[in-house]
Regions:
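Q-loop/switch helix immediately C-terminal to the Walker
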Residues: 105-120
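ABC ATPase C-loop
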Residues: 164-165
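Conserved ABC transporter NBD signature motif
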Residues: 72-80, 89
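Helix-to-loop junction immediately C-terminal to a conserved catalytic motif
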Residues: 64
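Conserved ABC ATPase signature
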Residues: 147-151, 155
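Conserved ABC ATPase "signature" region
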Residues: 125-143
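Catalytic Walker B motif of ABC-type/P-loop ATPase nucleotide-binding domains
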Residues: 172-176
């Protein structure tokens, strides 16, 4: 894995949020990668890049405990990822997959659904904070009262980023956060993530978007 420090944050913290040591992931006879090492520090925004089939999304899912390791270890916030600790670790993580399932008919219902989960009830829903995030991401407040099918793919993507940030988890893991966005909206996401990181959130993402990757603190290429 190649790494490059792109924009080291001013308040760089040397405490490690994600520590990946010598991991290998295989599916049958297919080995995605072997002997991979990666550290993500508190308050960093880190992007994983690589070609299709390089294992980017599988690496994110391994951090979440959804994909088993063939070798090596992963620690999240100092806790070794294992079957008995996976649920505890996931409570610290906000996760946005590339394919978003939006079952609600109304945006106003959709944005409240994550807060009904037992693991997220302590966060508490705040429409005022959500609207602040909407503005930061270039979203009009009137979208809150729209039907989900009236909202574009790029708007849905940014709405979910705003809602997930509102959960106040220490770690955000997101797959292709700007895949449906134009350059202007991508820049808003970059600045939004920088703001979250400056407040102590750690962000691990996967992206093919060179503009987005260039705005991250570190880029790792598989």
């Amino acid at each position: 894995m190649e790494s490059a420090a792109v924009n080291a944050p001013d308040s760089f913290c040397f405490y490690v949020m994600i520590n990946i040591e010598n991991i290998s992931i295989s599916f049958g006879n297919l080995t995605l990668f072997r002997g991979l090492d990666l550290q993500v520090h508190y308050g960093e925004g880190v992007c994983i890049c690589g070609g299709s089939g390089s294992g980017k999304s599988s690496l994110l899912k391994a951090v979440l405990g959804f994909v088993p390791l063939s070798e090596g270890t992963i620690k999240v916030d100092g806790t070794l990822l294992a079957p008995r600790t996976a649920d505890h670790i996931r409570k610290k993580i906000a996760w946005i997959p590339q394919e978003l399932a939006l079952p609600s008919e109304w945006v106003s219902e959709m944005v409240r659904m994550p807060f009904e989960l037992k693991a997220n009830r302590e966060a508490g829903f705040s429409k005022e904070r959500l609207m602040d995030y909407f503005v930061s991401l270039g979203l009009e407040e009137k979208l809150y009262d729209k039907r989900v099918n009236e909202v574009s793919g790029g708007q849905r993507q940014r709405i979910m980023l705003a809602v997930t940030a509102l959960l106040d988890k220490p770690l955000l893991v997101v797959d292709e956060p700007t895949s449906a966005l134009d350059p202007e909206s991508c820049l808003r996401v970059i600045n939004f993530f920088k703001s979250l990181c400056s407040k102590g959130m750690t962000i691990l993402s996967v992206s093919h978007d060179k503009q987005f990757a260039a705005g991250c603190d570190k880029v790792f290429t598989l």
